[in-house]
Amino acid sequence: MAKQDSVQLMTKGSIAKQIIGYAIPIFIGYLFQQLYNTVDALIVGNFLGQNALAAVTSVGSLIFLFVGFFNGFATGASVIIANAIGAQDEDRTKKAVYTTATFGIILGLIMTVSGYVLTDQMLMWMGSPQEVFGLSSTYLKIYFLGGFSLVLYNMLVGIIRAGGDAKHPLYYLIVSSILNVILDVVFITVFKMGVAGAAWATIISEFASMFLCAVQLAREESILHISWLHLTLDFENLKQICIYGLPTGLQGCVIDFANVMIQSYINSFGAAAIAGIGAYSKVEGFIFLPEISFSMALTTFVSQNEGAGQKERSRKGILFGLAASLLMIECMGVLIFLFAPTFISFFNQNLEVIEIGVARAKICAFFYILLGFSHVVSSVLRGLGRPVMPMVVMLVCWCAVRVVVLMIVGQSIHSLYLTHWLYPITWGLSSIVYVFDLRKYKLFTPRV
């Protein structure tokens, strides 16, 4: 079996070319991932009906609650590894790589066990409607059985991307996406497995992508090589991964906690509301792709260049990535605004479902630039070694404000429009805080 060296330094060469070259494979990869999530919802909604669609889409916030927390450690590990690579510290890099892989196995087992055991309790806490409770429970329990693969996959991708390689994860996502769609069709339309079929299709495809990442790292000839029979855990590196990863994980966790609360509120409006918001969330996922791609590119770019002491190059990269990301996400927002009814109708033909989804689109579409700004800046701060600031901002603006407003205003105003407006308002609050924080960083002043 051929060996390979996929490490690519981002400390020299064209800044724009490197950031775009790194971001494009991530964008395409997440596009495929979003497409298979969308196809999953399309198949469920059209073949299994409104309740099945509501069951699958309504648990998305719970899944993100778990995945967002554990992904924080993958981001933290990626920052540590990228910084060590930029500093050309081979010993520190190797220890961080092995610690990340070993820790990923541990975290994967934790997610699988805790998610499976807590499924029904979490659904009751969310106030899942009786007509979708059983379907949601079935889907979630099967999904969490594959949680190990998902967490380990994200940790391994963090290692690969820290070395500047975004292409191989793209290939694995494409394979996983195609496999997921094929299995969806077979399990749901041929074997009549219902929502269980959708869940099994997802976890099998996630295992495939995790396995491909593991094989790549075993074949590496670079400092990213992993010998899977000789895994070790370096506690100093584990400490650093937790220092960087825990704030990021908590950031994702608190955001998703707020989203779970909002989903609980939405659940009180019945299956049509759940399906309408759920369908739009699938459409909305495409809007996030540009800022996710550039955010991840900037985290690695900044980490490597800060590790190499190239602060001015880091600053220029931040400015370019921020401008490109905001331009793209707002273009996507305009597109969604214009064609929301068509996009929503792909998932369900029920007029009430379409109307609810379109209402969310019309309110949020022109505010996505604020969301993009907040996400990109938080990723930059993590790359700069400041993961606590984004956590605090998101905890206050995206969690506390949303939950408090929902608990106070939601008691007197029982309207879905409250949930529609909560998002752009809190995106604006976080953007204001980040503007003041960037002034201290002197983003528009050359650094030496």
For every predicted segment, state its role.
Residues 21-40, 142, 153, 176, ...:
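Transmembrane helical elements of multi-pass membrane transporters/channels
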Residues 53-113, 150-169, 276-340, 371-394:
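Small-residue-rich hydrophobic transmembrane alpha-helices
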Residues 50-61, 140, 199, 271-286, ...:
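Small-residue hotspots at the loop-to-helix junctions and early N-terminal turns
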